[in-house]
Amino acid sequence: MTKVELAKLRTMIPEMRRVRRIHFIGIGGAGMGGIAEVLANEGYQISGSDIANNRVTEHLASLGAEIQIGHKPENVHGASVVVVSTAIHGDNPEVMAARELRIPVVRRAEMLAELMRYRHGIAIAGTHGKTTTTSLIASVYAQAGADPTFVIGGLLNSAGTNARLGTSRYLIAEADESDASFLHLQPMVAIVTNIEADHMDTYGGDFTKLRATFLEFLHNLPFYGLAVVCIDDPVIRELLPEIGRATITYGYSEDADVQVQEFVQEGSQSQFRLRLQDGSFLPLRLNLPGRHNALNAAATVAVALEDHIPTDAIVDALAQFAGVGRRFQQYGEFDTGAGKVLLVDDYGHHPTEVRATLAATRAAWPERRLVLVFQPHRYTRTRDLYDDFAEVLAKVDVLIMLDVYAAGEDPIPGADGRSLCRSIRQRGTLDPIFVATPAEVPGVLADVLKDGDVVLTQGAGNVGQLSRKLAELKLSINAMKTAI
């Protein structure tokens, strides 16, 4: 951003008083790194720490951020404010040092709320579909020349980043319910894609509390704000009479304000039309597969039309959408030495997400054998949704199961990869292969792959690094057998 553009931005969005250097603990996460990037481009000094370097930290360093590997008390010296990710606890040495030095410590969502304060905020919440919906909206607004600021939980392929500082009043961002921190946000438009049991440890195992928290999030809208919600979701349908804000519904349901009709998947693309609120129809081609992604597109259209985004920009952006990192990301088809095999990677880590991804994969390549490499994410989620996982994972042709990616949690007996394998095996339809570490997966794949297979790697942990490794090896049988 040029000095002239930044000066113009400052006429709309004043600086945070007395804040010069902002320190991020856990800066390597996509959400934290995205906010840090926007603030760096706004002219703030950025520093941060994490336990290891990654693409996010390397990118931020290229923007001038000071990155420290490891958490040490001295890292926070000179900071005006410290921002912490969900994974950072009060006993972190940098948090303790900041409090001793009386430096404000705020959560990620509080800093996002500050970015949103003077902007037209569009916040996307829900158990599933947040990242894709946020990316679709950002792409549509960019296509229309609206130049939005966006903060996304995944890499927007067309932009080459997950965050960008725009010159307009629009800020498009994911709203994270995992720790209820989305309640800090006060957007002008709030989307809720669905509400299912997840992160239940945050809500004391009480689904009623989770439901009430989503309602509170919607009530953070001003009275002149707009809620956009998926009426196909039974919990949202039940909530509708309680939402005291202007509301637009979308879905496949006949009574949706914006209804998805005539859905057809062609390979890894989709075609459908939307019946809009005025009764007119909008035919669309979406460069994504799956009925669930048509819903994400419907939410996007509902929001964009309310902001008077031109229809041709909407149509073009959805047809040309270049995707999001780790959301049905196709690495391509490789000649393995035993035939041609397609590699796809996906972030889905909840049974509903896995089910939707498997359905989209089957629809795209119905004649091909589906080999799933799955890594459960969090022991609490595996425990709470154990039967659902066992049911959906049994529906592939070959299942390679990794152990649980802990994400900082302590192990829970019976809520692990081996136990899931036993439960699936007892169903009698599939014999899963348990693999203790991602490093062992290439060798196992080398023994099971056949010509025409689709390999789908799925999960929210480090299985994404595994998929990149497999792509580097080009799924070569010989290379995978010797990989370490």
UniProtKB/Swiss-Prot annotation:
Protein EC: 6.3.2.8
Entry's localization field: Cytoplasm
Binding site for ATP: G126, T127, H128, G129, K130, T131, T132
Presence of keyword Ligase: yes
GO cellular component entries: cytoplasm
Keyword list, A-Z: ATP-binding, Cell cycle, Cell division, Cell shape, Cell wall biogenesis/degradation, Cytoplasm, Ligase, Nucleotide-binding, Peptidoglycan synthesis
SUPFAM superfamilies xref list: MurCD N-terminal domain, MurD-like peptide ligases, catalytic domain, MurD-like peptide ligases, peptide-binding domain
Reactions it catalyzes: UDP-N-acetyl-alpha-D-muramate + L-alanine + ATP = UDP-N-acetyl-alpha-D-muramoyl-L-alanine + ADP + phosphate + H(+)
Annotated InterPro entries: Mur-like_cat_sf, Mur_ligase_C, Mur_ligase_C_dom_sf, Mur_ligase_cen, Mur_ligase_N, MurCDEF_pg_biosynth, UDP-N-AcMur_Ala_ligase_MurC
Keyword Nucleotide-binding tagged: yes
Single GO molecular function: ATP binding
GO biological-process terms attached to the record: cell division; cell wall organization; peptidoglycan biosynthetic process; regulation of cell shape
Pfam families referenced in this protein's UniProt entry, alphabetically: Mur_ligase, Mur_ligase_C, Mur_ligase_M
Function of the molecule: Cell wall formation.
HAMAP family registered for this protein in UniProt: MurC
Entry similarity comment: Belongs to the MurCDEF family.
Name under which the protein is recorded: UDP-N-acetylmuramate--L-alanine ligase
Organism annotation: Tolumonas auensis (strain DSM 9187 / NBRC 110442 / TA 4)
